[in-house]
Amino acid sequence: MVELQGLHKSFNSHHVLNDMNLSIKKGTTLVVIGRSGCGKSVMLKHIIGVLRPDSGRVFVDGQDIWELKRRDMERLRKRMNMVFQGGALFDSLNVGENVGFELIEEGRVSEAEMRKRVKESLGMVDLSGVESLMPSELSGGMRKRVALARAICTKPELLLYDEPTTGVDPITADSINELIRSLHDKLKVTSIVVTHDMKSAYKIADRIAMLYQGRIIAEGSPSEIQNTDNPVVRQFINGLARGPITESTDS
């Protein structure tokens, strides 16, 4: 469903993506691991078309997104959604308004249909009946679930997750992992998750890829990644201070 070919992206003199290649099959969950700041979020922004590569191509369903007309690009984006690292909820809107925001803002459905979808989406993330609460009344884990409900409310075919378990305790993180896996199975969506949390990666991934120095250096099933001989991957997944990865080599 998604293919990245030879992506290069620099910000000033910092080369973030350096001939990055990656392919994601329809209906699978791919987890991209790597150190903080290695370019994982930049990769996601290329997939949804927020960032344009300096060179290279981004394909979604066989279409080069940067060769599409604006109207076609807008249609394509409506088939995707993203769960942001911090949730990105609007503090001035209640939960129901946050979850249904995109549907109403873009005039996709009637208000009655929007309320129906909001109720369904909140039920799928185990938050039934919280529509009237404000974001300030929610725990960190609840905010993450509301953000996920907002993402699935538009019925996307492709879901992108940016560090979905960052900032929550291990028990809440595990419940979010279970929810991601459950939603994938129920909705049959294609999912791309970026994280440096290996417990999450092993739990939710069909396949795992590691981004290092701007390119994918390893890809495989969770079992293959766990048993890799690649010294860089082994150092990262085992959380070891000593090894080929240093602050200078990863920058």
Where are these regions (language model features)?
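Helix-to-loop junction immediately C-terminal to a conserved catalytic motif
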Residues: I48
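Conserved ABC ATPase "signature" region
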Residues: Q63-D64, E111-G129
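Short coil-to-helix segment of the ABC ATPase nucleotide-binding domain corresponding to the Q-loop/switch region
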Residues: S92-F101
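Conserved ABC ATPase signature
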Residues: M134-L138, M142
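A short, proline-enriched helix->beta-strand linker immediately N-terminal to the Walker B motif
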Residues: C153-E157
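Catalytic Walker B motif of ABC-type/P-loop ATPase nucleotide-binding domains
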Residues: L159-D162
